[in-house]
Amino acid sequence: MTKTDIAARVYNHTWKLDPIVRSLIDTDFYKLLMLQMIWKLYPDVDATFSLINRTKSVRLAEVIDEKELREQLDHARTLRLSKKEMIWLAGNSFYGRAQIFEPEFLTWLSNFQLPDYELSKRDGQYVLDFHGSWKETTMWEIPALAIINELRSRTALKALGPFTLDVLYARAKAKMWEKVERLRELPDLHISDFGTRRRHSFLWQRWCVEALKEGVPHAFTGTSNVLLAMDSDLEAVGTNAHELPMVAAALAKTDEELGKAPYKVLRDWNRLYGGNLLVVLPDAFGTASFLRNAPEWVADWTGFRPDSAPPIEGGEKIIDWWKKMGRDPRQKLLIFSDGLDVDAIIATYKHFEGRVRMGFGWGTNLTNDFAGCAPTEIHGLNPISIVCKVIEANGRPAVKLSDNPQKATGEPAEVERYLKFFGAEDRVDHEVLV
């Protein structure tokens, strides 16, 4: 892989446009897996995605220049899959399976273009929406977030000279390497990069991936970023996301269909994928409700990804459920990925060691941790909690409840309706930092 002097690159402002998103596969692998399912099973569904900044104190429209934002969004719309990328997607094995992407899907994908966007300002925030066919709008989620986050980072760094930038990145590299050295203490660790959506920059994410590859080669299982996986000869990792049950629930016309929605999309998923891709994300409408009503066959899936409950608490509930269902947790997999940093990874690993198979998806605190690295504090380098969520499907509002009420999305009246239907037990407020 080409080595880049990141500090020098950041300081060099001579490019007419320095693209943030360099490829359509500069995205999370699970977006492609979900895209194939949407293309195959839900081709006529429309879905609207919207940017949601949960860190209200950061007024993005007052930080990021609108002209620069439009230029980056417009550039992303010019991207098409290259011949090299098509060959790699068609010929590579993923999760031990050859040709996971159907030839007809890849033919369609070869002509794919990101759809148009709507951008405006309201109360110091950007209103960024993507309307259209679900199989098109879904692909905006990751590039939109990457663009917003990197433009914010670039704005924060504009006033710094080359020497200060050099010190900043030297300290950030040292800080990252200290984390890697601590992870070496865990003998059977399995960890992957989940940091694309809220990364400091593409180049920094690439450096962090290289650091994991170099520092913990036996523990590092791959990256969710498809472009980096291809370029670095790594495994592309990822399963599925909340948008699947959110859309299925939005489309439900009866209470019976609403109750079955979280399991319907799992059946759909199982039609296309298997093995280690059979990982349940249970918290879209609350993990307690999901487990209480889950069919027997869900217990036969490979594992769960507890996403919004504290990792130890969430993991224990799933282990208890497996035992209740007569399954041996030692043969099952838990993937932890919610706002993790080294302390939480180590504590969670030690708590569950020997009781269950574990994997860790390391996100924002891997690819966007510059706290204490600048000579003077730069608030613009602190990560924010920003998401791009589906808010509507076929004109019907979409909702996410989560195990953490602070992560809930949707119209208040619809959120209340879902809470009455699914229940609110075991939902606990805790601060959302990333």
Curated annotation (Swiss-Prot):
Modifications made to the protein after synthesis: Transiently phosphorylated on a His residue during the reaction cycle. Phosphorylation strongly increases the affinity for substrates and increases the rate of nicotinate D-ribonucleotide production. Dephosphorylation regenerates the low-affinity form of the enzyme, leading to product release.
Name a single GO cellular component.
cytosol
State the EC number(s): 6.3.4.21
Q: Which domain of life is it from?
A: Bacteria
Q: Which Pfam families match?
A: NAPRTase, NAPRTase_N
UniProt keyword annotations, A-Z = Ligase, Phosphoprotein, Pyridine nucleotide biosynthesis
Main EC class the enzyme belongs to: ligase
Coiled-coil regions listed in the entry: none
Supply the Gene3D superfamilies for this chain. Answer: nicotinate phosphoribosyltransferase
> In its keyword annotation, does this UniProt entry include Phosphoprotein?
yes
Family named by the database record: Belongs to the NAPRTase family.
Q: What is the documented function of this protein?
A: Catalyzes the synthesis of beta-nicotinate D-ribonucleotide from nicotinate and 5-phospho-D-ribose 1-phosphate at the expense of ATP.
Q: What is this protein called?
A: Nicotinate phosphoribosyltransferase
